[in-house]
Amino acid sequence: MKPRSGDKLKIDGIKLSGELVQINLLPGTDFSAARLFCEMAGRRINMPLVTLDAAADRLAGACCIAAEDLARAQPVLEAASGALQVIERVGSLTVFPHRARFDLFECMLSGFARRGLPVHAIASSLAALTFTTDYGRLDEAAAAVLEKAALPDNHAPFRPEFKVRQI
């Protein structure tokens, strides 16, 4: 149900990530997403965000790793430097539930534009809509969304309090 003019969109939550490194898989190269994922898995590097785009038999996309995993990922990134773009100091902002609501996407995109916030990647599912932006501006990104969207009473954007690491 679309809100009346002046009403805010109702959302259930906003999750902000810790500091991430975004790895963009560039189209038109011989380096595959499967190879990237296998290389990261072999180094026990978790990817908390993955989004892929397939068009005309070409695969492009982005994934994120924790900033503290960058040194362990460096050999993979250097070996595939022409096929990857690396963006450091990225964070993700996830709004839920999404439920394929175009008005929520519009709210987030226009909020980012009003504040001049970069959008490095967008990922969606029926449950959530995620934007990546500059890590140092995540709180500003949340404020931009909350100009047009409303959380339930006694809720605020949250960050993870702990992280599980594979050993």
Language-model features and meaning:
Residues M1-I167:
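A conserved regulatory-domain signal marking ACT and ACT-like small-molecule sensing domains
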